[in-house]
From Swiss-Prot:
One of its GO terms (biological process) is protein modification process. Its EC number is 2.3.1.181. Belongs to the LipB family. The lineage of its organism: Bacteria, Pseudomonadati, Dictyoglomota, Dictyoglomia, Dictyoglomales. CDD domains: LipB. Transmembrane segments: none annotated. Pathway: Protein modification; protein lipoylation via endogenous pathway; protein N(6)-(lipoyl)lysine from octanoyl-[acyl-carrier-protein]: step 1/2. In the reaction, the free carboxyl group of octanoic acid is attached via an amide linkage to the epsilon-amino group of a specific lysine residue of lipoyl domains of lipoate-dependent enzymes. GO terms for molecular function: lipoyl(octanoyl) transferase activity. This is Octanoyltransferase. Coiled coil: none annotated.
Length: 232
């Protein structure tokens, strides 16, 4: 049986805490201590810049961001610069990976399936990573792979404030706009419904037989996660 573990945070999580969690779970996955794991959450406002990103794509000073309550963090994922914040669904994939290109395509297809269910004609782009509605980006994707195990993932705009994207050149792409489910479908689905649809779509695209969801409010609650897995 090919199982998927889903860690679902019901409260907003600081980016640094989620990053530390990914590293710990990545080590466990490399050792085959855990199954492939999908983390679903919302972040407090933060702008992240990928390892090959250009800081020139940040249009505000770090002091200005701080005054607005937005953190700025350099990270080791692919991609350039992006924004995370409340009401945006972020998913981190701690998966064994055989081929990078095929893996990214499956991530994109997983999100596209969900958006189609909401009546949004989303698609992938041959030229740029992520998920698009015409020339508007609705989902950013940035992946890192180490020892054949992935981390980082996607950020799907649900009904989040899009104004902070004007503080950056999203993903380093000039003249490209961002959008959200709310903007495209004229309604805002409950976040729990979006999460459920994402889980089902990931199961389908990656060929899992089943999935198990564990709900948490903070990263500290995961201290006994390894012990819990031993009982599965």
């Amino acid at each position: 049986m090919k199982k998927l573990l889903v860690i679902d945070f019901r409260e907003k999580i600081k980016y640094e805490d989620a990053w530390d969690l990914q590293k710990k779970l990545h080590d466990l996955r490399v050792k085959d201590t855990i199954y492939d794991t999908l983390i679903l959450l919302e972040h407090f406002p933060v702008i992240t810049l990928g390892k090959f990103g250009d800081e020139k794509n940040l249009l505000k000073t770090k002091e200005e961001l701080k005054s607005m309550g937005i953190d700025f963090i350099r990270v080791d994922r692919g991609g350039d610069i992006t924004y995370h914040g409340p009401s945006q669904l972020v998913g981190y994939f701690i998966f064994k990976v055989d081929g990078v290109k095929n893996f990214v395509l499956k991530v994109e297809k997983s999100i596209i399936n969900v958006l189609h269910e909401y009546g949004i004609e989303a698609k992938e782009s041959i030229e740029y990573p992520g998920v698009w509605v015409e020339d508007r980006k609705i989902t950013a994707i940035g992946i890192a792979i180490k020892k054949r195990v992935s981390y980082h993932g996607f950020a799907l705009n649900v009904n989040n404030d899009l104004a902070p994207f004007s503080y950056i050149i999203p993903c380093g792409l000039k003249d490209k706009k961002v959008t959200s489910i709310l903007k495209e479908a004229n309604f805002s689905p409950p976040m729990e419904d979006v999460k459920r649809k994402v889980c089902l779509s990931v199961v389908k695209e990656f060929g899992f037989d089943s999935f198990m969801v564990f709900n948490f409010s903070s990263c500290k609650e995961l201290s006994n996660f390894g012990m819990l897995l031993e009982d599965l």
